[in-house]
């Protein structure tokens, strides 16, 4: 990537950046874009100019969150781990292996972590998927909340074949989630302190394709990466906008930039720059790793 990529980012056109990269878990933090590449077991950062920096990891990372202490929480298959971010960022990741924090569903070897992020209170909320996924696969995936204060708590949500699209309303009281093997996005009432969910209900049903990653903007609208398109939904579930994309295998949309008004969509073929239509994102809550 070079200066041309930076100009394209400012222009807000649907253009692929780093087309050879598998961009998963895309998010904005500390004035940089960050993502993981599950295929190469690496974490990347990019300041929207020049080449991205890369740190190889012992295992593939499917989700991650930044911590209040400056560390990063990594989701690696069956484990949540902590890793240090040295100065400059990523310098320390390759030198010391991540430190395991908690095993996830160790009695069920058929699952692995598939998606996750922090809720508005700084807890890490994530889901699992069947490790060997096929269309209409077995629904053995679950949803969890992790914090240092309470440890790992399972959320009382329906099992899924592949958990995706985990995100939260601006006030943190509604959780959105989806099963990538189904054509629907669901929502529920969410109590972060008690790790309690209630009133699970349909948010949106897809006519075609499958829902993957999602994010919520400052106006409470949900942006969903689906099979070859990005869809924006109103808080009541009405589809407001649908933009086709050249990549079928989309991963996650994210807002970034100094004003959180730049919209990128990760995919198995790089990042796609989109016109957000004036929408702005919300900053990710930092994982609270200082509570005991």
Model-inferred region functions:
Residues 90-156:
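Hydrophobic alpha-helical segments and helix pairs
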Residues 254-292:
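Blade-level signature of beta-propeller repeat domains, shared across WD40, Kelch, NHL, RCC1
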Residues 42-44, 79, 141-144, 184-186, ...:
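A short loop-to-beta-strand structural motif that recurs across blades of beta-propeller domains
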